[in-house]
A protein has these predicted regions:
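Conserved lysine of the Walker
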Residues: 44
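ATP-dependent NMP and nucleoside kinases share a basic, alpha-helical "lid"
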Residues: 118-177
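Hydrophobic anchor at the beta1->P-loop junction of P-loop NTPases
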Residues: 36
Length: 232
């Protein structure tokens, strides 16, 4: 678990640290968000849980199945749940703004199995100066969070496409997310597209890395260091 209350210290993150700047320990730390993205099945939820930080699940901002604006997979009748058009970015950003401003927000509870919202719940992060917002579309709101001064870091988890495929399929079957034929069609499509997905997230401002480096960057944020500009 990361300690968000200790004063800034040397960052364990790897690579060039020129995009980090220290925050004074003598004044209260403003609440900021780490946007955690990556291909479906890349380990975002597991990493978030391991960090011990509060987590906003961006998957809960999916549109419902009867929304006429939902996109379709090209050449298919399947809804394209991997398109940013299937997701309510404005509502997600509004929730992040509320958490950074007041430490509390109401979020939808979304069932992926039924593609519907089943209720709402309160997410209260209290005085915690850092939280994670994780989901496959997190990179799509990097620029907006950066412009509002809310961004601590943006991370894209990267791994082997074959490993991601196996992890994603096992999870989706275990949770009964969709039918097996749908999961297989989606899984093969995403495995072939995975390198392009990571490249897109990087172009949107997320730093692509494996789990250990991601944990190091989270620790740097928890120590009071944040990005001054989006990563190249």
């Amino acid at each position: 678990m990361l300690d968000t209350n200790r004063p800034p210290e040397a960052s364990p993150a790897r690579g060039n640290g020129s995009h980090w700047c220290p925050v004074s320990a003598s004044s209260p730390l403003p609440t900021r968000v780490v946007l955690l993205t990556g291909p479906s099945g890349s380990g975002k939820s597991r990493l978030s849980a391991r960090s011990g930080l509060p987590v906003l699940r961006l998957d809960d901002f999916y549109k419902e199945a009867d929304d006429p604006s939902l996109p379709l997979v090209e050449g298919s009748s399947d809804i394209d749940w991997d398109s940013p058009l299937s997701w309510d970015a404005d509502a997600a950003v509004a929730a992040i703004v509320e958490l950074c401003a007041g430490g509390r927000t109401e979020v939808p509870v979304y069932s992926i199995a039924t593609s519907s919202r089943t209720g709402t719940e309160t997410l209260d992060i209290s005085r915690t100066p850092l939280f994670i917002a994780e989901g496959i579309f997190a990179a799509d709101i990097v620029a907006r969070c950066q412009e509002m001064g809310l961004l601590a870091d943006a991370i894209c988890l990267r791994g082997r496409p074959s490993t991601t495929f196996r992890r994603r399929l096992a999870r989706d079957l275990r949770e009964g997310r969709k039918s097996l034929p749908f999961l297989l069609r989606r899984g093969w499509r995403l495995m072939r597209a995975e390198r392009g997905i990571v490249a897109r997230h990087t172009a949107l401002g997320a730093h692509a890395c494996a789990r250990d480096e991601a944990l190091g960057r989270l620790a740097a944020c928890a120590a009071g260091r944040h990005r001054t500009t989006a990563a190249a």
